[in-house]
Amino acid sequence: MATTKIILKKSVNNLGHAGDIVEVKAGYARNYLIPQGYAFPWTKGAAAQAEAMKRARLAKAIATREGAVEAKQIIEGTAVEIFAKVSESGKLFGGISNEQIANALAEKVAVDPKGITVEKIQTLGEFPATVALHPEISANFFVKVVAE
């Protein structure tokens, strides 16, 4: 398969951060990353622009690192309760989304739903979850699903 170099405009999970030069399959770049505004094609001139983006991202990361440490202290080890409709057998109607978890966490700290990692929740119970607050800092917490 053919690959192509691109420069990321925004952070993409499991791929890289803004300003990173990555090599991906041509179809992924052409059909998804570039049209959705996540990336642009790599050129020699664009490589300099990528370096500027990377420097700006690093400066912002240093400023937000302190905030991420404070947020981790608040979130780490806590549990958030989410109320959901369930069938008589205890199975959820639908599932629990990252947006619902982020909204429940918003009472304590505002987080990006894209940074939340949790297994697929289909039943009542308590589930471990992780939220990325910063590229180097993440916090572990629990999602407790309770019947309405």
From Swiss-Prot:
This is Large ribosomal subunit protein bL9. Belongs to the bacterial ribosomal protein bL9 family. Keywords: Ribonucleoprotein, Ribosomal protein, RNA-binding, rRNA-binding. GO terms for biological process: translation. The keyword Coiled coil does not apply. GO terms for cellular component: ribonucleoprotein complex; ribosome. The gene is rplI. PANTHER family: 50S RIBOSOMAL PROTEIN L9. It comes from the Bacteria. InterPro entries: Ribosomal_bL9 (IPR000244), Ribosomal_bL9/RNase_H1_N (IPR009027), Ribosomal_bL9_bac/chp (IPR020594), Ribosomal_bL9_C (IPR020069), Ribosomal_bL9_C_sf (IPR036791), Ribosomal_bL9_N (IPR020070), Ribosomal_bL9_N_sf (IPR036935). Pfam families: Ribosomal_L9_C, Ribosomal_L9_N. The keyword rRNA-binding applies. Binds to the 23S rRNA. HAMAP family: Ribosomal_bL9. GO terms for molecular function: rRNA binding; structural constituent of ribosome.
